[in-house]
């Protein structure tokens, strides 16, 4: 059995629209491709480290390069011990891709999953002037679920304008941009627009305050 050879490549992907949330904005998405070579097969993984969690493309690549991996992609339980999350993510995906190719089966079959029962994810709309957000929603077309980033003001006006043109499921995400008091006030007002849920309304690490909102 041959040793697993790992290589990584950084990609800077220009975004069609600036992606703005309550705490940051970006026009380029930085991601890392992970390639795992083993027994003539290539497994591909990807990871997108976040500065919010003290990780970067550079730190993820360095962690992957320094980590011993052995010669068995099936030895998943202990393979990634000690790795930070972004590096672990990229390697985990690459190893699973290797396993699927080695077994000549798609992963959903190896996991015993029914593709027809796959949950539909949301399409995310970043913060922008309301007219721009409306245009982005129109670009989405008939996608059944959208997630709207909030947290910089004009929340009620924004969601009201979007609900006027969009009949699907709406989720909102404040990315820690509100206080508990603001959260209660805004969520009560937003309820009339049939919002499925609100993600991360207040700063992380304060579960007792989140409990108070609930």
Regions found by a protein language model. Name each.
Residues 148, 153-214:
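Catalytic core of soluble alpha/beta enzymes
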Residues 3-11, 120-127:
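Short amphipathic
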Residues 13-20:
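Short Pro/Gly-enriched beta-strand edge/turn motifs at strand-loop
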Residues 34, 40, 91, 104, ...:
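Conserved, mostly hydrophobic/aromatic
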């Amino acid at each position: 059995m041959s040793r697993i050879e790992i290589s990584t490549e950084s990609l800077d992907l220009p975004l069609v629209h600036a992606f703005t949330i309550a705490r940051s904005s970006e026009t380029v998405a930085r991601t890392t491709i992970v390639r795992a070579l083993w027994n003539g097969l290539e497994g591909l993984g990807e990871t997108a480290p976040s500065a919010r969690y003290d990780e970067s493309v550079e730190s993820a690549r360095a962690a992957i390069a320094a980590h011993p991996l052995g010669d068995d992609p099936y030895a998943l339980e202990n393979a990634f011990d000690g790795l930070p999350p972004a590096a672990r993510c990229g390697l985990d995906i690459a190893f699973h891709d290797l396993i699927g190719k080695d077994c000549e089966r798609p992963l959903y079959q190896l996991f015993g999953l029914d593709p027809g029962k796959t949950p539909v994810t949301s399409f995310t709309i970043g913060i922008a002037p309301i007219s721009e957000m409306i245009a982005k929603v129109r670009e989405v077309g008939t996608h059944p679920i959208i997630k709207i980033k909030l947290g910089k003001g004009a929340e009620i006006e924004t969601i009201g304008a979007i609900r006027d043109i969009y009949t699907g499921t709406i989720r909102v995400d404040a990315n820690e941009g509100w206080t508990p008091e603001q959260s209660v006030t805004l969520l009560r007002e937003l309820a009339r627009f049939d919002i499925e849920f609100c993600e991360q309304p207040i700063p992380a690490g304060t579960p007792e305050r989140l409990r108070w909102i609930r």
